[in-house]
A protein has these predicted regions:
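Phosphate/diphosphate-binding loops
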Residues: 9, 15, 393, 398-403, ...
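Glycine/threonine-rich phosphate-binding loop and adjacent beta-strand/alpha-helix elements that clamp
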Residues: 159, 428-451, 466
Length: 668
């Protein structure tokens, strides 16, 4: 029996980007475990990846191209050959381009894989085709906009520096579910006596590893940050020398903004008692190395960018930015280690085509004109359940005149609406290059098993489509490994000093940031820009979240057992999650005459979704929580939480507002 242990990388949209060891027996992955030699993840995996082989070799894997034979959404298909599938797609597209123009075609993708090649494989093809462009802003562009408004391109601290902190604030992040390896440094700091706080909208699993949890009203986090700054200034718990040398706009903030954020006012906005706010400010102001870990969820409100901007400004007042073990950790841009324009190939565009925001797919499919969307090509995403305003998305996908192609591993809800379904490889079956937004490691991954069935990678499919569409550019004739080799042949400052020998062996290797990178503030002024004259609001301020007419704020939160809609094919994980729950405070449930375990319906102006009610004191009054995105076949009413979320965008960054919606709840 041929047993081999091979290295790979977790491909999913998670900051941890774990190193994997895959046990392969006779060409089949039989076990997946963590790579103990990975510098950051150190051999541990989340429950989703611990049995990744069950996803890779699932009996539900798509193994052949399929053509629709029934109504859209019915899931009725017949097998066809790859040759026939590619031929049909190319013929349909050529006809559409002749009749409507190339902008009638829209690609839709996001981070189904984070590999630099396979994730971005469609960009050069669709640029060359002249298709409509997709504004890929569904996750956290508002967080990036908020950070950049203050810090520019200044890098965040290394996540392992958390071990050197004496106060760690997990602000708007359920780290156990979404960033579990960051907790390694948190636990080390706690052993040394550091205090650990969680600021969130409800008691999450992460509450179990912190010293204290502070629950705030959804969308009010910016007010809390301003209130803390008000008290730091009032009590002179600020670093005057650091402010004078490194901060632009402190005096303006002090005079024009902070006087309006006394504890009593902040208490009304956040729901925290004034005394608690004062205690938080004293502890933060007296800490020697306070570190804030900012979660992406904070940015998924109408005021998301401003909220992040305000929180990121807070450490500047106490001189925490630039000191080891302190400051603010948002994300790390390690993709800058590679010249990605060599993969994107924007130079293939003959003109800039229209840009369509992916959060407004429902609007695009149903209302866009001149031309209307006539074809949708979906890869690395499942918009039927992950895009907001689900009813509008499904309405658009149901259009008989919409030619939809879906490249997928499973018969997802989106695939059920496709005209052509193409089987996709898993990360263990293709080559790619990985970096992380949660640590500084980069790693090259080779296939560890052959493709399952007739599945093909993103790059292989786009190469076939390029040939079918008559593209002559040599670029499309390369392999994924050719593209990786090309990226590695171009030196960049971020890769200086990289351990090339270890990297070539397929192991994760850390990028080496200059020691002074965090105090060379990469902004136009060279300072932390609390005052940013280029922003619509030059100073950080409090912008309220969107108001709704319904009594409960809906938190569409992440699940411990899934990653958005990924892993929903796994019955073992679904059994652990048990059901599609809606969490509600006991007092609210009592006022409505509702009991735990009963069928309920959450509803608003966009739609209604059945849930099983879970009554728990972990959720504050006037808030309800729905964790995870379920496939519709597992949802009690054939709808999931995004039937209740709006297509509205954030204040900056044009991001999603998944956390900024209101609902009411009734008995089911």
């Amino acid at each position: 029996m041929g047993i081999k242990m091979k290295r790979s990388v977790c491909p999913y949209d998670c900051p941890d980007a774990c190193g994997l060891l895959v046990e392969v027996v006779n060409g089949k992955a039989v076990r997946v475990k963590g790579d103990s030699e990975h510098p950051f993840t150190r051999g541990t995996l989340c429950p989703k990846m611990n049995r990744y082989q069950e996803t890779v070799h699932s009996p539900l894997r798509l193994t052949r191209p399929l053509m629709r034979t029934g109504a859209k959404g019915s899931g009725l298909f017949r097998p066809i050959s790859w040759e026939e599938a590619i031929k049909q797609i190319a013929e349909r597209w050529r006809g559409m381009i002749a009749r409507y123009g190339s902008e009638a075609i829209l690609p839709y993708s996001y981070a189904g894989t984070m590999g630099l090649i396979q994730r971005n494989a469609g960009h050069p093809f669709f640029y060359r085709l002249g298709a409509s462009r997709l504004d890929r802003t569904i996750c956290s562009p508002a967080k990036q906009a908020g950070w950049k408004a203050v810090m520019g391109e200044t890098p965040a601290p290394h996540p392992d520096e958390a071990a050197e902190s004496d106060l760690i604030i997990l602000w708007g992040i359920n780290a156990i579910a979404t960033n579990i390896h960051f907790l390694h440094g948190v636990k080390q700091a706690k052993k040394k006596g550091a205090r650990i706080w969680l600021i969130d909208t409800y008691q999450t699993l992460t509450s179990s590893v912190v010293d204290q949890t502070f629950l705030v009203q959804p969308g009010s986090d910016g007010a809390l940050a301003l209130g803390l700054m008000h008290l730091l200034v009032q009590w002179n718990l600020i670093d005057h020398d650091f402010i004078t040398t490194h901060v632009q706009g402190f005096e303006e903030l002090k005079e024009k903004i902070l006087p309006d954020f006394r504890p009593e006012q902040v208490s009304q906005l956040t729901g925290l008692p004034s005394g608690v706010i004062e205690s938080m400010a004293k502890t933060y102001g007296k800490a020697k190395r306070p570190l804030i870990r900012v979660g992406a969820g904070l940015s998924r409100y109408g005021n998301g960018a401003m909220t992040i901007r305000t929180i990121v400004s807070l450490p500047a007042l106490v001189g925490a930015h630039g000191k080891r073990g302190s400051g603010c950790f948002s994300s790390i841009n390690t993709s800058g280690a590679f010249v990605m324009k060599e993969i994107f190939r924007e130079d293939f565009m003959t003109k800039a085509t229209r840009l369509i925001n992916m959060n407004q797919l429902g609007l695009a499919l149903n209302e866009l004109k001149d031309p209307s969307i006539q074809s949708l090509y979906v890869y690395c995403s499942n918009p039927a359940v992950v895009a907001p305003d689900q009813n509008q998305v499904l309405k658009g996908l149901s259009r008989e005149d919409l030619f939809t192609v879906v490249h997928e591993r499973f018969m997802t809800d989106t695939a059920r609406y496709a005209d052509i379904v193409l089987p996709a490889t898993s990360s263990l079956e293709h080559s790619d290059l990985y970096c992380s937004y949660g640590h500084t490691c980069v790693q090259r991954a080779q296939p560890v098993i052959s493709p399952v069935g007739e599945s093909k990678s993103n790059w292989e499919v786009f190469s076939l489509l390029a040939r079918a569409m008559g593209f002559e550019e040599p670029f499309f004739k390369q392999t994924a490994d050719d593209l990786i080799d090309h990226l590695l042949s171009i030196p960049t400052p971020m890769r200086e000093g990289l351990d090339e020998k270890t990297f070539a062996a397929g192991k994760a290797v850390e990028l080496l940031f200059p020691p002074d990178a965090r105090i060379r503030f990469q902004t136009p002024s060279g300072k932390i820009e609390i005052l940013n004259p280029r922003e619509p609001h030059p100073l950080p301020c409090y912008l309220p979240p969107y108001e709704g007419e319904y009594p409960f704020r809906l938190m569409a939160a992440p699940s411990f057992y899934a990653l958005n809609s990924t892993f929903r094919e796994r019955e073992d994980l679904r059994k652990k999650e048990k059901a599609m729950f809606l969490k509600m405070n006991p007092a609210d449930a009592g006022a409505k005459g509702l009991k735990g375990g009963q069928d309920v319906v959450a509803f608003n102006e966009l739609g209604e979704v059945p849930f099983i009610l879970q009554v728990t004191p972990d959720v504050p009054r006037r808030v309800v929580v729905a964790e995870g995105i379920w496939w519709l076949e597992h949802a009690p009413g054939n709808r999931s939480v995004n039937a209740l979320t709006s297509q509205r965008l954030t204040d900056r960054g044009a991001g999603s507002t998944f956390y900024d919606n209101t609902v009411d709840v009734k008995s089911g």
